[in-house]
């Protein structure tokens, strides 16, 4: 094998030596391609696995933790929620519409492959500076393309996209982040797993035909960008949501039978990863007859068939004798379905082309025992330069308030979420635009499931460990503010180039923060994804661990809003304000800096707040609640009253006027009627949570917070109209 071919497959000299040892000979091109894909960062998690192993993954309500297509938790009365978040960053930067669309398609397949009907989607989007003279126009193009791709796929599939977050920062100028989350619901006893066992059991290919799109996608997603990356468009897969809709319905019909042993979607590395993962998890071997693959293009080679990432395809291990019945279901839905192999006990993948053996590879070294790297780490040098920076006000709070409310990181994103169908399936209780977590009704048991997606990249830049822990806490707090109990998380860890020791240090610290927070807050990790190499021309993104928290409220009718719908409601701030301005939005807007050093998270205070919100809502004491986040109580209150029909007369009583922009954790704003105040304050005392009265909601169309005063019309214009103008 010549060195250029090996290099083109991103195989190092050390890895090639391992390949020679595993095979006992030189690989052929097909085998090299397969091993390259399975050992890519995207498929093997070789740089990250050692840090992920310490995550807490168990709890009485966890049915399935990491290692399957998606995580599963018990949501009561025999029902389960199946969910996962993952990235499609690199493809979305190269081809925003197709990249984002297939990102949605991939995560939907991960969920319905487990036997669940998908009932909700969320997304976390990070773009570059839309005001930048050089790249602003391109960033707007990316925003529009990505949003269009997500809405097209989700809407066509009939899956409601009910929430998300969108942030902008120059650190994403060269690498945008597109993280998609999906949640499905099924009976706890009806979950299907990705396994291939039972010697002689048939392996069946179902779904769309295989083309050349997406070739080398897993390897491409395991590398950083440079000038040549513009030619990578052919590696972006093309999605067809209508085919996926048929595939989902066919799979859900199949799941009502007892015809199959296991099922796996063909995602990154296509047929390669699905076959190796199924056999690897089961300790089996497999024979695949590649010439039987349904092909969209003529003249395709075994190499192309094994590595194509054409969308809307699944691999099924059926019970012997049931092949025809499985095929009949997929034919009914107008999809391809062919027996293309069988399970063996050899522990090897045997690849045939017109009955000739063209590839023979041991499965375990590519799946369960793929190489794990221990990359060097070193604390980033910039941390010593930024840690002592202190924020001081340089302009009036009214001026800053206006600048912040109309900033693209805070203002309303109706331009984005209006393109998503959030009400299809008629289960949505609280969707995008209503602040905080999104909520769906589970008709089968009367409960509701709340979900929130969260990542503040600036905080992770300032302190990677505490920043990641804060993402876990913040996502959970948003769920708690709906009245639900946070139960578990899914994570999508977006970082720069792992070959840079400083990036690897950030990653290790981020994992430590997630591990600590999940343990202390009792929200185990049940699924996730790692996206590395988010770097262009040597510049990495800020560390961005996206966290989705999922919780359950036993009675869907008790779901809390985040808006004040009545006058004369008492407005309270819960939790302590500690003056946290490090990495804050007010610092970024006023000083154009991301600096400081974060305070440790007080887990007891965070949990006490969650427990108080849950108990107070169970006792019907609250009218509304919202987590305090970016921009402090100033922005939280502004947004709550912007989406409300009433005005506000509020006083913070802070000694320092800048404290309204403080971003301390473990805080929430609540609204309650005066007759419930005493009972609530007694309860807050019981839980050890400080409650500070800020004022009341009023019938006057006016917003007042300390020295800040605006008419309701001015407030609404700043919040609702700004982004539409900025994105044009």
Curated annotation (Swiss-Prot):
Keyword rRNA-binding included in the entry's annotation: no
Pfam family name, one: AIRS
Recorded catalytic activity of this chain's protein: N(2)-formyl-N(1)-(5-phospho-beta-D-ribosyl)glycinamide + L-glutamine + ATP + H2O = 2-formamido-N(1)-(5-O-phospho-beta-D-ribosyl)acetamidine + L-glutamate + ADP + phosphate + H(+)
EC number: 6.3.5.3
Chain positions recorded as Mg(2+) 2 binding sites: 110, 265
Compartments, as annotated in UniProt: Cytoplasm
Gene3D superfamilies: PurM-like C-terminal domain, PurM-like, N-terminal domain
Metabolic or biological pathway: Purine metabolism; IMP biosynthesis via de novo pathway; 5-amino-1-(5-phospho-D-ribosyl)imidazole from N(2)-formyl-N(1)-(5-phospho-D-ribosyl)glycinamide: step 1/2
Molecular function via GO: ATP binding; magnesium ion binding; phosphoribosylformylglycinamidine synthase activity
Residues annotated to bind ATP: 45, 84, 491, 528
Protein family: Belongs to the FGAMS family.
Complex formation: Monomer. Part of the FGAM synthase complex composed of 1 PurL, 1 PurQ and 2 PurS subunits.
Record-given protein name: Phosphoribosylformylglycinamidine synthase subunit PurL
Source species: Campylobacter jejuni subsp. jejuni serotype O:2 (strain ATCC 700819 / NCTC 11168)
Lineage, top ranks: Bacteria, Pseudomonadati, Campylobacterota, Epsilonproteobacteria, Campylobacterales
Encoding gene (name): purL
